[in-house]
Amino acid sequence: MLADAEWNEKKVLDRRTSRDHVLKGVSGGFAQLCHGKEAPLKRMNPDDWIIYYSPKQNLKDDAPYQKFTAVGEVSDNRVYKVHAGEGFSPYRRKINFLKCRETPIHPFIPNLSFIKNKRHWGYSFRFGHIEISEHDFKLIVKQMVKI
């Protein structure tokens, strides 16, 4: 699953997803990105990996949380639509989440290549779904799952 020989897959980071929403996805075994949009899910392939970053614990709380909250592997080719109520029908994709611990971002900032401006590191998260390097992925995941 995370053996060094298996690093040909795409690694993506989803930012700006509150912790409570990430945990719903983890418990349900799915990813839902960019307010339920289909396109970012379609760009992913089986065996690709996703790391969730949560700036807040929930949408109503303004207190910063700023942790990597989940890591998982795309399990199949299917992107599907669900009816979540109140006219909201988001797209989802099946993910096999690893058991991991939530990890603060701050110790990683100096060493993450996708963060170009270390002083204003939050700018790196303005796009919802970004591909990250193998180096960045390994750095984060090794702390989250203690490989």
Swiss-Prot record:
Record-linked SUPFAM superfamilies: PUA domain-like
Pfam families named among the record's database cross-references: EVE
InterPro entries according to UniProt: EVE_domain, PUA-like_sf, UPF0310
Family per similarity comment: Belongs to the UPF0310 family.
NCBIfam families named among the record's database cross-references: PRK02268.1-2
HAMAP family, alphabetized: UPF0310
Stated name of the protein: UPF0310 protein in gntR 5'region
Organism name: Bacillus licheniformis
Gene this protein is translated from: oug
